[in-house]
Amino acid sequence: VIITGAPVEHLAFEEVKYWDEFVNITNEARNLCASTLGLCWAGFALAYLAGVNKTVFDKKLFGVFPLKSLSPGHPLMGTQDDEFICPQSRFAGLPDLEMEEAQKEGKLNLLAYGKDVGYTIFETKDQKQLMHLGHPEYTVHRIISEINRDKEKGDVPPPENFDINSSNTSWRSHRNLLFQQWLWFCYQQVS
């Protein structure tokens, strides 16, 4: 199951209209599916269910940022480069110390970190839920669409590390490997 994001980071999870449905779906998926992948807000929501709450930012974290693989031998990270890049578009993050504590307590495996974006890819210890706070699925056109939308709001900085005049999707290999390896991981769990 893949659950995507929603622009509701500013709300407490319990204030989101569909929170109860989200919890029910993720509980059912945990029992019926090999793995659930939560992207952006869904990743934050899964982290919250694992015991780590988000911190809301004053300004949007927006752009294409470097990440470092923390677990090169992991089934999902082993094919990634040691360092790779991924789009981010969010108004929240997870506190590093709380994430590290959750790993020490055996709740999470931390898989990728960026100095500007924090822990971005992680999973539950039982590997049933994978969280990615970024947007590996984004295309150049999607980022440009967000730039244009945000210009109308006037309060969002332009994206970092992104050239609007380039059609280069420099995170394509990360995206393709992530989804390929996740699907392969799911297949191996059920075969």
Where do the model's predicted regions map?
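Cysteine-nucleophile active-site neighborhood
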Residues: 3-74
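Amide-donor transfer/coupling interface in amidating biosynthetic enzymes
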Residues: 69-191
